[in-house]
């Protein structure tokens, strides 16, 4: 009895404890309570140090638990959740990565789910442990359990790298036919991820994408839109046939035909609508026929998107964007304009911002919209929200012209002084510098504006702004007197700034000052060089000046030393800095000391800017040709450009192989550099093309935008015969009465006898200054700049072309004549013909040409205006509008007959002679072999056979063989040759096989070279198309070629290029020429040519690096041998 009681009393505490912990669930409680306790403990801490101590203790405990061999999968799952929480806090839990993969491999559904979740959070695409997950994913993709398949598809679309795609791609393709819509949708999203990282590997399943677009489930269809939006952005023309499908889908969405679960606050599938609108905007761009298919659905979208929720505002914004992107329709434009007006006039800040953003976009096509909302835009300039003010400045930037540049730049500077955010300062400083260089009214305003830019922008602004400003001062403009006045005012302004006491200037501004004072102080009459050196010496002695800036200052002092005539400050400067701890400054001091001791050497080296001639750098390093030739003869490897080496490196990289017998798969091709978009120089002679291609900017893009508005109003509307819009009154001058400022309001006020207040008058005066030049007589172009602008700072032409003396009373222009010659007489010529002079006479030197069918006809070259050149534009080469007196070039048309080479014997024997010649057709190279019998005997079964050649496609033409070649008769064999992939040269080889009467057959072998030049053809495009191609190409090559005869005319240079390289002259503007060609079948290349005093600067851009390198090399040979 006593034993029984004792046992009962002993067991009671355990029973009470079990009930307290929750009975049977008590075994799970410690793990969940630990996670909850960890979260509560972290949130209760008051310092980062305490948090780190707690997490490290937890990680140590977890490491011991997961490493223990007795740990169950259930315990591992709960530990993995705590590891995820630790990683989310930023602490390293890498010891658990391998256990997460094991958990995904071995657990049940819940444990596998936690394992996959941990893997997707722990690992990235390039992590080496991902290789261990491939077999698990493949096994789960083949599983019959839907949850396992979904988990595998999810992790594939999240973290799978491009090297592992071939292992799972066939399985994911099969899932596109799965009966469950969730599997099909996740498979489409996985393929979308593959398309983003390796588009070449999914090219063969584009037809399955179309099936997904027509899937019966809305979720699968919506997932496929992600892929199509991406593909249409890259190549809209290839998917025009799907326009009706997208329109039909949008009609069903707008009409509410989708299930209710796709609606958001009673708005049917808003994000699906937005994607479809973006797709339609890309498909209908510059395509009237395609745009007509979507007019009705866009009208319906505008009508049904009632302003009752924020998401409908996004739909309306996309509708407006699409309407102004496609081929325009007047009714839709009017409705879109009303929608923009509702946004702009809305009291809600978000809607006002959306309206300004839409107005900023559409202002490029319809500048009259800005005239309708002038007062609202003026009010937005003083809006308390900084984002509204910044977007308003962006809008004003788009409509800047020579008449309103002063007021707009002033507003930008006011905002710049108030802003503290670095990225805003960088963006605004670049735009102000661009506008100042393009539309500066005078020298004083330009220098003062740039001083403000350097002062406010400081050391955070783009370094190219500094170098471009100095280059502009150094190169000058067309007027030498104006150049000197600009430089003199710059020197005077900088001396005035340096004389101000207790004023701090940014380091880059001081660098600009030092360079200008060192170069152009000789222009001063009242200030001596010693006084300038004194000011520079004070800066050198300041402790707040950086070592880099001191180097600039030292260089300026060195330039001024020959003019200072043994200034004691120079000797004092040498003594102080020859013992400096800074290596660079000490080197400068010793150089100055050496020059100071040798007066003759100093005078010969430091002649001053007034005695210096223009220096043209030889970027091609032609003076090293002998050294290169010697190295190549001794077996040295030829130089390969960086992009070519990178392509070879990518092609040789090993990839993971998931098949036992080496299943091949196409790897993603090398993607070239992005098109240049940096704040950069125009037509640089010795610039680095690699650096140019890597810069970035916020400059405006004009690529692909069609001009819909001109001086006569809305161009497509007038062409269609509809009525014209009423013209807004043009504001003649600043301060005049504005007749088009909120006209409806003004008329209403006048009817009611309203007298404008002082504040309203000030707004109207400001509007007259900001929106001057936006009337129909002076509209803005696609970039928001005036159509006709008197460019203040135009680069100086280094070479003056001789003017004709035949008509001294009329303005003359240089005549140019170019010819594209053939290798033999009879080739057609493509050259510059006579130009139309002011007196109506034609005068030029025409090149003689012999044609196979007669002289070619001449055709006037269409002159297409481009924006004015800018040092700060997003493109390194821009062509400015020529003056009205400039010459208009004409180009000869191709002759009807194809050009061909001469007949050349390539092999022969005692019985047969084989000759060949090339015919350069527009679509291919035609090689014709002529087989001629030398004897009286007849021979039979004559056949010509060509061996296959890598990179070339050879097609036998009709009548290519002859059963019998009669005595003394010649028979021709024709083969068309096409280059499939660009290469420098190929060798075409084969044999002619024939049999004489009553004798054995004879085989005669031959070979011939096929250089790349055989596949280059002139490309006939407009100047506008030239600009678009220039912006779209990634591979560019620059080189400067010295010419033997200084002062050569541009026409002579273009003639040589046309005759020898089959280029076509697109336009000639001043001392610059635009040329274009294409590598068959369709690889274009554009060339910008500029003639200097004793050199020619050439700049090639093409989608093929081989083509641009080849043309660059051969241009140098042509120019040096001419």
Swiss-Prot record:
Component of the adaptor protein complex 4 (AP-4). Adaptor protein complexes are vesicle coat components involved both in vesicle formation and cargo selection. They control the vesicular transport of proteins in different trafficking pathways. AP-4 forms a non clathrin-associated coat on vesicles departing the trans-Golgi network (TGN) and may be involved in the targeting of proteins from the trans-Golgi network (TGN) to the endosomal-lysosomal system. One of its GO terms (biological process) is intracellular protein transport. The gene is Ap4e1. One of its GO terms (cellular component) is trans-Golgi network. Coiled coil: none annotated. Residues 714-728, 745-760 have a biased composition (Basic and acidic residues). It comes from the Eukaryota. Residues 841-853 have a biased composition (Low complexity). Signal peptide: none annotated. Keywords: Golgi apparatus, Membrane, Phosphoprotein, Protein transport, Transport. Pfam families: Adaptin_N, AP4E_app_platf. The modification Phosphoserine is found at residues 699, 851. Residues 714-760, 797-861 are annotated as: Disordered. It is found in: Golgi apparatus, trans-Golgi network membrane. The lineage of its organism: Eukaryota, Metazoa, Chordata, Craniata, Vertebrata. Belongs to the adaptor complexes large subunit family. Residues 726-1122 are annotated as: Interaction with TEPSIN. It is a peripheral membrane protein. Adaptor protein complex 4 (AP-4) is a heterotetramer composed of two large adaptins (epsilon-type subunit AP4E1 and beta-type subunit AP4B1), a medium adaptin (mu-type subunit AP4M1) and a small adaptin (sigma-type AP4S1). Interacts with TEPSIN. Interacts with GRIA2; probably indirect it mediates the somatodendritic localization of GRIA2 in neurons. This is AP-4 complex subunit epsilon-1. Its main location: Golgi.
């Amino acid at each position: 009895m006593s034993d029984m009681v004792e046992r009962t009393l002993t067991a009671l505490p355990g029973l009470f404890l079990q009930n307290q912990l929750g009975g049977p669930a008590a075994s799970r409680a410690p793990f969940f309570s630990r996670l909850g306790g960890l979260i509560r403990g972290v949130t209760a801490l008051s310092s980062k140090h305490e948090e780190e101590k707690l997490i490290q203790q937890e990680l140590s405990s977890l490491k011991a638990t997961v490493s223990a061999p007795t740990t169950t999968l259930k315990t591992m799952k709960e530990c993995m959740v705590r590891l995820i929480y630790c990683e989310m806090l930023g602490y390293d839990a890498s010891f658990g990565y391998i256990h997460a993969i094991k958990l995904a491999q071995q657990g049940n559904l819940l444990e596998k789910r936690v394992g996959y979740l941990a893997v997707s959070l722990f690992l990235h695409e390039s992590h080496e442990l991902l290789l261990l997950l491939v077999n698990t994913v493949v096994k789960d993709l083949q599983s019959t359990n839907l949850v396992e398949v979904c988990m595998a598809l999810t992790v594939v679309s999240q973290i799978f790298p491009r090297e592992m795609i071939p292992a799972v791609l066939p399985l994911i393709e099969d899932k596109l036919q799965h009966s469950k819509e969730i599997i099909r949708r996740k498979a489409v999203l996985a393929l979308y991820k593959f398309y983003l990282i390796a588009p070449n590997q999914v090219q063969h399943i584009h037809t399955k994408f179309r099936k997904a677009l027509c899937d019966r489930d809305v979720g699968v269809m919506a997932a496929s839109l992600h892929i199509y939006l991406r593909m249409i952005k890259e190549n809209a023309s290839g998917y025009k046939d799907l326009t009706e499908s997208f329109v039909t889908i949008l009609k069903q969405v707008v009409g509410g035909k989708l299930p209710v679960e796709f609606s958001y606050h009673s708005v049917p599938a808003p994000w699906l609508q937005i994607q479809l609108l973006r797709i339609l905007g890309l498909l209908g761009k510059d395509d009237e026929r395609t745009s007509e298919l979507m007019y009705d659905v866009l009208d319906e979208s505008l009508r049904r998107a009632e302003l009752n929720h924020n998401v409908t505002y996004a739909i309306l914004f996309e509708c407006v964007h699409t309407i102004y992107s496609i081929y325009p329709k007047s009714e839709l434009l009017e409705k879109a304009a009303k929608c923009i007006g509702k946004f702009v006039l809305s009291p809600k800040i978000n809607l006002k911002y959306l309206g300004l953003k839409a107005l900023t976009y559409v202002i490029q096509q319809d500048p009259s919209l800005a005239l309708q909302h002038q007062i609202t835009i003026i009010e937005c300039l003083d809006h308390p929200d900084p984002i509204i003010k910044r977007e308003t400045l962006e809008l004003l930037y788009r409509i800047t012209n020579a008449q309103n540049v002063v007021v707009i730049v002033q507003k930008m500077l006011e905002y710049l002084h108030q802003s503290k955010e670095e990225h805003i300062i960088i963006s605004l400083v670049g735009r102000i510098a661009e506008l100042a260089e393009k539309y500066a009214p005078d020298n004083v305003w330009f220098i003062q504006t740039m001083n403000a830019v350097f002062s406010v922008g400081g050391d955070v602004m783009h370094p190219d702004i500094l170098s471009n400003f100095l280059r502009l001062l150094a190169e000058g403009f067309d007027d030498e007197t104006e150049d000197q006045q600009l430089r003199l005012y710059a020197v005077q302004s900088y001396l005035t700034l340096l004389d101000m006491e207790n004023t701090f200037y940014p380091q880059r501004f001081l660098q600009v000052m030092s360079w200008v004072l060192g170069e152009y102080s000789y222009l001063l009459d009242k200030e001596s060089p010693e006084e300038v050196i004194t000011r520079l010496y004070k800066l050198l002695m300041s402790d707040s000046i950086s070592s880099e800036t001191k180097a600039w200052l030292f260089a300026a002092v060195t330039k001024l030393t020959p003019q200072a005539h043994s200034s004691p400050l120079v000797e004092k400067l040498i003594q102080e800095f020859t013992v400096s701890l800074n290596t660079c400054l000490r080197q400068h001091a010793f150089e100055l000391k050496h020059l100071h001791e040798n007066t003759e050497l100093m005078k010969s080296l430091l002649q001053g800017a007034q005695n210096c001639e223009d220096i043209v750098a030889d970027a091609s390093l032609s003076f090293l040709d002998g050294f290169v030739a010697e190295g190549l003869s001794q077996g040295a490897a030829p130089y390969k450009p960086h992009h070519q080496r990178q392509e070879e490196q990518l092609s040789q990289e090993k990839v993971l192989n998931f098949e036992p017998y080496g299943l091949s798969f196409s790897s993603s091709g090398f993607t070239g550099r992005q098109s240049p978009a940096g704040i950069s120089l125009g037509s640089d002679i010795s610039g680095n093309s690699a650096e140019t291609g890597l810069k970035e900017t916020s400059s405006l893009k004009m690529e692909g935008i069609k001009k819909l508005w001109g001086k006569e109003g809305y161009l497509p509307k007038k062409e269609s015969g509809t009525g014209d819009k009423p013209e807004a009154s043009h504001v003649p001058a600043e301060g005049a009465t504005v007749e088009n400022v909120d006209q409806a309001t003004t008329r209403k006020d006048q009817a009611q006898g309203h007298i404008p207040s002082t504040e309203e008058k000030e707004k109207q005066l400001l509007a007259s200054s900001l929106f001057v030049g936006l009337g129909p007589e002076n509209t803005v172009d696609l970039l928001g700049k005036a159509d006709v602008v008197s460019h203040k700072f135009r680069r100086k032409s280094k070479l003056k072309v001789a003017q004709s003396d035949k008509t001294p009373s009329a303005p003359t222009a240089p005549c140019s004549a170019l010819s594209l010659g053939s290798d033999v007489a009879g080739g057609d010529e493509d050259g510059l013909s006579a130009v139309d002079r002011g007196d109506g006479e034609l005068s030029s030197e025409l090149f003689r040409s012999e044609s196979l069918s007669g002289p070619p006809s001449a055709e006037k070259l269409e002159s297409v205006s481009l924006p004015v050149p800018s040092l700060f534009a997003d493109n390194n080469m821009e062509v400015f509008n020529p003056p009205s007196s400039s010459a208009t070039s004409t180009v000869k048309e191709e002759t009807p007959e194809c050009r061909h080479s001469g007949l050349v014997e390539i092999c022969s024997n005692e019985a047969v002679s084989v000759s060949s010649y090339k015919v350069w057709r527009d679509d291919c190279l035609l090689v014709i072999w002529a087989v001629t019998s030398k004897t009286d005997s007849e021979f039979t079964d004559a056949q010509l056979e060509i061996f296959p050649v890598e990179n070339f496609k050879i097609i036998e033409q009709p009548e290519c063989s002859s059963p019998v070649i009669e005595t003394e008769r010649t028979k021709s064999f024709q083969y068309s040759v096409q280059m499939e992939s660009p290469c420098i040269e190929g060798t075409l080889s084969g044999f002619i096989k024939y049999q004489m009467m009553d004798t054995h057959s004879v085989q005669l072998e031959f070979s011939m070279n096929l250089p790349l030049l055989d596949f280059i053809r002139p490309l006939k495009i407009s100047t506008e198309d030239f600009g678009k191609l220039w912006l779209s190409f990634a591979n560019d090559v620059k080189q400067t070629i010295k010419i033997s005869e200084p002062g050569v005319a541009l026409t002579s240079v273009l003639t040589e290029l046309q005759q020898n390289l089959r280029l076509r002259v697109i336009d000639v503007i001043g001392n610059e020429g635009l040329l274009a060609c294409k590598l068959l079948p369709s690889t274009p290349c554009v060339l910008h040519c500029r003639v200097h005093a004793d050199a020619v600067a050439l700049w090639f851009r093409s989608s093929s690096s081989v083509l641009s390198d080849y043309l660059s090399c051969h241009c140098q040979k042509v120019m040096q041998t001419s």
